Amino acid sequence: MKGLFVDTAGWLACADIADPAHVKAAAARDTWLQEGGLLVTTDYVADETLTLLRVRLGLATAEEWWQLVDSSPRLRWEYVSLARSDKARAFFFRYRDKEFSFTDCTSFVIMRELKLQEVLTTDHHFTQAGFLTLPK
């Protein structure tokens, strides 16, 4: 099954109807799922997403999002282990000319490990790291 990584910016764009990328992001996610694909995300991305949803859209929206993703059979959870964290830290400090967040670096490590090329996000850092972003 083909996997699409979902970054915090992708989750936010899908959840927030006021987000400029909402329509395209939700359509890209829905098309991916309709074509039999699997969504992939991490515990670090979920941490960021829950926090930002609560701040921007309220606790009820954050809770609704959590219930939706937590029960989804089409979502694969990946966790940032100590080994993955060590690799992410090395990546974080290697690219001094980029403003990658540490969470982004953990995502890059996991995406490379799982051989995922596509990511649902509006964050340009994924393009800088060599991944293909959706929506286009």
Region locations from a protein language model:
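Acidic, PIN/NYN-like endoribonuclease modules and their adjacent C-terminal/linker elements
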Residues: 108-136
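Alpha-helix boundary recognition
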Residues: 33-34, 54, 67-71, 93, ...
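Short secondary-structure boundary segments
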Residues: 43-44, 104, 123-124
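Short acidic, glycine/proline-enriched helix-loop-strand junctions
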Residues: 69-81, 95-97, 126-136
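Active-site neighborhoods of divalent-metal-dependent phosphate/nucleic-acid chemistry enzymes
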Residues: 75-118
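Short, well-structured N-terminal submotif of metal-dependent ribonuclease cores
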Residues: 1-41, 54-68, 135-136
